[in-house]
Amino acid sequence: VAEVASTQLTMPMISPRSPGAIWHAVSADRRSLLTWQEGSEDIQVLATGVNLRRPQVLRDHSIMTFSDTDPTLIVVGSDGARMSTVVDLGGCRVTSFSVAPDAVRVALVLERGKTRALGIGLLSRQEGAVHLSHITDIPLSSSDVNLSIITDVAWLSQTRLCVLGRAIDAGVTTPYEIVVDGSGATSMGQLTATSMAAVVALPTEMGTEAVVLCEDGTLLLHEESFRWRQILQGVSAVAVTA
């Protein structure tokens, strides 16, 4: 497995009689979108593509990912029906994405040659098809020099994003909170000398918090301002089960 899907769904209470959690993941070669339920010996292939990105489970229990082919947006419904649409990205590649809590806006990390920028698009469904359109760059202040290279993104609320970024290729990747209108970026703390590899949003009853995975396998939970709590070590992927 290369990456595991995260979800917008707040986690329910688990009882001893609850069925095993359902996981969605991208295969190690990034060519298959997989689903598996804990306790089962069967792994189901939901969709295939090229260089599939970390998927996300939406509130309607559909699963969304991107393929580098063309490029293509892939959504698999809760009934197993697959919808795919070629997206006009103007020659860019999607390296990461996150769907907003409203299930309409999608934050995108867009690779343009050697640069990576942040964009936002609108998701819509019409007549059994899914579309991503009106993609625009999220403007960042010229003072936000540490965000010249963005590597990952997750929604913290309807108006706030957590992004991982650095100033130069050889720099350390750290987390920032930004407002979607691009009015400013706020550092969420220099955690360690090790770069952050991935960020996901953790839905809770009190709101949403960021969880980041460091390149050394340390998993950290954002609790307040500059405070981060270590959860685990030796981790290779981070997600929230659906």
Which residue ranges define each predicted feature?
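An edge-strand/N-cap motif at the start of beta-rich repeat modules
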Residues: 1-4, 9-36
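Repeated scaffold domains used in trafficking and secretory/extracellular systems
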Residues: 8-16, 51-56, 92-98, 146-153, ...
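Recurrent small/Gly-Pro-centered beta-turn motifs in extracellular repeat architectures
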Residues: 27, 67, 108-110, 163-166, ...
